[in-house]
């Protein structure tokens, strides 16, 4: 791969190492990552937000190849070269999450309607999947029903929001998790344009299903929310997204993509039972916090 990188980007590579589908490079006293694109990356979206990202010294830059393209195709695989900044590759904390990096251009969207449409499509897809592969997912049937039910409650909650606040587009990420690191956070190929509550909601949800000390996290979250500005509408959007069980749907999609064997069914049942217990316990704590802090409707998981 070294010769391809040097050819397409006219670099003289001093050091190169490979780890987890990406190459770490030192060239001309600068650090780079050459990575395969796994998610759908739209170059037009990057060009749209590039001026916004350029105002900050932490986001990585996508380097054009010698032909002026953001994406380089090698053996039918798509890659990008990222020029790194001087941030350490540490696991993100709650306070690393920003909700105020607004997109240039005074654009206004309706993310509530977009979420409703996408979530309804996701529910429809998984109901159809369960109907068509009922035998394969036999052991997971109760989990499907449980999480689909919660998903439908989340959609109903979104539909009940009648606040008139405008959805101002900000920098967010596809799926922020408690295990995500700063390299993920500042990588523009992971960035999407969405409502300001998306990242924090997905992070909270990830903590809820993975944390061994939810009480300590709730105290940290309380301090974080006090340090940020969210409207009542933002909080309702955040709460709805916390409730929507993306972690379950993501995992089933992973099963579908990797064609995991049915023999793992009982193992998966045990996993989802444990996650459901953590989720329900975490939602109880979050309900208490949100009820004390905000005047919003609360749903019991």
Regions found by a protein language model. Name each.
Residues 62, 155-200:
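Active-site acidic catalytic loop and adjacent metal/ATP-binding pocket
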Residues 91-143:
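A cross-family kinase active-site recognition segment
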Residues 2-29, 40, 64:
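ATP-binding glycine-rich phosphate-binding loop
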Residues 197-229, 242-264, 268:
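Active-site activation/catalytic loop segments of kinase-like enzymes and analogous catalytic loops
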Residues 127-174, 282-300:
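An alpha-helical support segment within catalytic cores of ATP-dependent transferases
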Residues 27-108:
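ATP-binding pocket architecture of kinase catalytic cores
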Residues 249-301:
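ATP/Mg2+ or Mg2+-diphosphate-binding catalytic cores
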């Amino acid at each position: 791969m070294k010769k391809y990188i040097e050819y397409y980007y006219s670099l003289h590579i001093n050091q190169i190492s490979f780890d987890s589908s990406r190459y770490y490079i030192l060239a001309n006293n600068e650090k780079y990552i050459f990575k395969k694109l796994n998610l759908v990356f739209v170059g037009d979206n990057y060009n749209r937000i590039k001026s916004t990202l350029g105002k900050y010294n932490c986001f990585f830059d996508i380097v054009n190849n010698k032909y002026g393209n953001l994406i380089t195709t090698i053996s039918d695989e798509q890659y990008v070269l990222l020029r790194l900044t001087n941030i350490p590759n540490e696991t993100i904390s709650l306070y690393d999450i920003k909700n105020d990096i607004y997109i240039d251009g005074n654009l206004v969207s309706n993310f509530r309607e977009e979420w409703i449409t996408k979530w309804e499509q996701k529910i429809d897809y998984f109901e159809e999947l369960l109907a068509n592969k009922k035998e394969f997912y036999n052991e997971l049937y109760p989990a499907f029903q449980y999480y689909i039910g919660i998903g439908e409650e989340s959609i109903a909650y979104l539909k009940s929001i009648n606040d008139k606040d405008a959805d101002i587009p900000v920098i967010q990420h596809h799926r922020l998790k408690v295990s995500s690191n700063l390299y993920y956070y500042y990588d523009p190929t992971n960035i999407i344009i969405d409502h300001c509550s998306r990242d924090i909601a997905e992070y909270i949800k990830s903590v809820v299903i993975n944390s061994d000390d939810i009480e300590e996290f709730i105290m940290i979250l309380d301090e974080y929310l006090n340090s940020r500005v969210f409207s009542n509408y933002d909080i309702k959007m955040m709460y709805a997204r916390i409730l929507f069980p993306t972690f379950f749907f993501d995992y089933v999609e992973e099963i579908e993509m990797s064609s995991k064997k049915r023999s793992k069914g009982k193992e998966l049942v045990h996993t989802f039972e444990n996650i459901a217990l953590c989720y329900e316990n975490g939602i109880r704590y979050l309900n208490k916090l949100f009820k004390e802090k905000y005047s919003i409707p609360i749903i019991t998981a």
